[in-house]
Amino acid sequence: MNNAPHLYFAWQQLVEKSQLMLRLATEEQWDELIASEMAYVNAVQEIAHLTEEVAPSTTMQEQLRPMLHLILDNESKVKQLLQIRMDELAKLVGQSSVQKSVLSAYGDQGGFVLAPQDNLF
C-alpha cells in the first residue's frame, strides 16, 4: 500500500498545528495553546502510526525533512516562550507568598492600627 500522499498530508497538517501553537504562544494566548496541544499530539501519533505501517522511501524522507526542521524549530520557540511564562508565574507566586506572609504576620493586630506616637513622654 502506498501511503505516501497520506503521510505527506499528515506532515502538512502537523506543520500547520505547529505554526498555530507558535502563534498562540507568541500572542500569549495560553489557554488556547493548551487547548490546541491535544490536536498536535494526535497528529504526531498519526504520523507515527503511518510510519510504522510502511517506512517512507528515501525520496519521501528528503521531502519531509524541511517540514521536520520547521516543526522542531517551532517547538523550540514555543518551549522558550513557555519557560518565560513559567518564570513570570513563579515570580507572581513568590510575590503572593510574601504578601500572604506579611498579612499573616501583621494582620492579627486585633483591629488596631499601629502607628508611632508623637507624645512618648
UniProtKB/Swiss-Prot annotation:
Q: What is its main location?
A: cytoplasm
Locate the region Required for homodimerization: 1-50
Q: Does the keyword Ligase apply?
A: no
| Biological process terms in GO annotation | bacterial-type flagellum organization; negative regulation of bacterial-type flagellum assembly; protein folding
Q: Where in the cell is it found?
A: Cytoplasm, Cytosol
InterPro entries referenced in this protein's UniProt entry, alphabetically: FliT
Reading the lineage from the top rank, the first entry is Bacteria
Q: Name one GO cellular component term.
A: cytosol
**Keyword Secreted on this protein?**
no
Among the Pfam families in the record, one is FliT
Q: What does this protein do?
A: Dual-function protein that regulates the transcription of class 2 flagellar operons and that also acts as an export chaperone for the filament-capping protein FliD. As a transcriptional regulator, acts as an anti-FlhDC factor; it directly binds FlhC, thus inhibiting the binding of the FlhC/FlhD complex to class 2 promoters, resulting in decreased expression of class 2 flagellar operons. As a chaperone, effects FliD transition to the membrane by preventing its premature polymerization, and by directing it to the export apparatus.
Know the name of this protein?
Flagellar protein FliT
Q: Which gene encodes it?
A: fliT
